[in-house]
């Protein structure tokens, strides 16, 4: 019984010296961060695409993917702004299974979170410095935010965390775009309350001190579908649901309204191939309705080198968590989006 210490106290400033961005790399990241902020504020009309593996389990495969994605970003940069998913901590429904690079930097060995922190920073650093892309990650543990805040450009608050007050309050101190998912129940009021709390100033105890925040006006919505009590799936990217969501967005009076459609999870019913159809249908809905076009300006897509998923890391570039689109389909889909816009 109880919580038992496994390591000495973590020195955040010492951790930040690992894989630290400097010089031209820091300047390039800052420039892309400003572009991303303009996209969220509606000052840049490019479509936001947050795309990449469900979980970043293999550094070589993730970098391989990142180099391919970087070349494609250059090709479509006039209409699409890409942020790569480099998700390093994974929520587990029942607490079991692979929990991400943060927990297990080597999938063949036992959890090692201290080395996991170093591995996470190293991976984000390599993607940024070797490809010129900037990265997205889920803030699964609110206490870990300071460990990566200088590297991650887009933060996501997951479906299981969006109701949590500490996640909301910590997110209110983030000065980068922060997407907040609807909860697994599909209750959009919960999500909008989360965005409201995140956009406002907050006071709370964080780590070992009383803190206050300035509020995060770049917090926005991610629609990921819902899971029913009977284990079914309820998508929330349909035309009529989007109109209701937009109406609720307006009623809350939030700053910088912006909706990202998560094409996997409960929207796809875990059928990764459905992501292609969901993107196509959403683009049609944007063309059909000006309000949808104004609000729905981003996609979150799970994609890797190989189609599908596997239980253990045997096939290079194939997900060991949720199934993903392979690179061929990913490349074709991004080009299709670019041509359609």
Go through the PLM ranges and name each one.
Residues 48-61, 322:
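Conserved phosphate/anionic-ligand binding catalytic regions in large, soluble enzymes, centered on
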Residues 1-41:
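N- or domain-start disorder-to-order transition segments that initiate the globular core
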Residues 54-57, 256, 264-270:
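Short acidic, Gly/Ser-rich segments with clustered Asp/Glu that frequently serve as metal-coordination loops
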Residues 52, 261, 326:
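Conserved, mostly hydrophobic/aromatic
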Residues 303-341:
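Internal helix-turn-beta structural module
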Residues 7, 66, 79-244, 248, ...:
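Active-site-facing alpha/beta catalytic cores
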Residues 37-45, 251-256:
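Glycine-rich phosphate/diphosphate-binding loops that line cofactor/substrate pockets in enzymes
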């Amino acid at each position: 019984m109880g919580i038992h210490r496994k390591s000495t106290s973590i020195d955040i400033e010492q951790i930040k010296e690992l894989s630290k961005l400097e010089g031209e790399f820091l300047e390039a990241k800052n420039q892309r961060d400003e572009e991303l902020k303009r996209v969220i504020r509606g000052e840049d009309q490019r479509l936001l695409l947050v795309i990449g593996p469900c979980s970043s389990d293999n550094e070589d495969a993730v970098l391989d993917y990142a180099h391919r994605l970087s070349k494609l970003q250059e090709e479509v940069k006039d209409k699409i702004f890409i942020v790569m998913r480099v998700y390093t901590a994974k929520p587990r429904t029942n607490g079991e299974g692979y929990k991400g690079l943060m927990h297990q930097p080597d999938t063949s060995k036992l959890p090692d979170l201290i080395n996991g922190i170093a591995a996470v920073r190293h991976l984000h650093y390599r993607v940024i410095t070797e490809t010129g892309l900037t990265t997205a990650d889920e803030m699964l543990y609110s206490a870990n935010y300071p460990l990566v805040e200088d590297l991650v450009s887009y933060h996501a608050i997951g479906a299981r965390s969006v109701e949590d007050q500490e996640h909301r309050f910590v997110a209110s101190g983030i000065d980068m775009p922060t997407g907040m998912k609807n909860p697994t129940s599909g209750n959009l009021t919960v999500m909008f309350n989360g965005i409201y709390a995140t956009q406002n100033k907050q006071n709370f105890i964080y780590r070992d001190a009383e803190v206050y925040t300035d509020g995060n006006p770049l917090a926005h919505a991610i629609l990921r579908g819902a899971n029913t009590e009977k284990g079914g799936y309820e998508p929330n990217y349909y035309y009529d649901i989007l109109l209701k969501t937009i109406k609720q967005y307006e009623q809350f009076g939030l700053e910088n309204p912006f909706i990202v459609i998560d094409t996997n999870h409960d929207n796809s019913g875990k059928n990764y191939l459905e992501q292609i159809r969901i993107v196509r249908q959403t683009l049609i809905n944007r063309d059909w309705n000006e309000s949808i076009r104004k609000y729905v300006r981003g996609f979150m897509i799970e994609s890797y080198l190989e189609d599908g998923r596997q239980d253990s890391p045997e096939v290079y570039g194939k997900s060991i968590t949720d199934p993903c689109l392979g690179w061929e389909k990913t490349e074709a889909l991004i080009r299709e989006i670019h041509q359609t816009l």
